[in-house]
Amino acid sequence: LRKHGATATANICAEAVQLYPALGRDLVARGFEISCHGRRWETPLGLTEEEERKWITDSVAAIESVCGVRPVGWHCRCPHTVNTRRLLIEEGGFIYDSDAYDDDLPRFFADTPSDRSQPHVILPYSLDTNDMRYQLAAAGFPTATQFTEYCCDAFDWLWDEVRKTRRLRRFYAKNDHFTKTGSGQTQGKLKIETCFLSGR
């Protein structure tokens, strides 16, 4: 990323960064943009509107207290609720969310309130270069080498396209999740997944 002058986004869960604060501070020190992945890798489905609002604000506060900066992006485990995007906009500090799987290109959210200085951006999430494909027996990746090659090819293609079209695209590398077991042990690795390619 440094070689190409690209920015990167760390999509992190609040509990994960609280468990490993040095990693969160290091990401910021290295210039990573911080995006919130929720409190844990969980869906807000089933929460009341007020519970979801608190879930969002608590997640933001936890990340900001560790990293020293607030997250500017959001992507929770699907499915999100009918309230999620509106609550993110009302919270006021998010530039974009990635709770969409319906397109390859980003877009402005048409219902962004007119009093905002800039429209809210929907930056669709792609499962194509996500570790989700490890879970598919027929179309999955049996080896790390194959997955790495696939991701590198996708990155190279997107990088070339950005240079030609000047469009913003999103790329995901392998994402590992923190999980807390019943015994209180933590398993997994810090989730660092996103590169924004703007062609600027």
Predicted regions and their residues:
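Catalytic alpha-helical scaffold of carbohydrate-active enzymes acting on polysaccharides/glycoconjugates
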Residues: L1-G73, R77-L127, T148-K174, T179-R200
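Surface-exposed cleft-lining segments at the edges of enzyme active sites
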Residues: R70-P71, L136-Q146
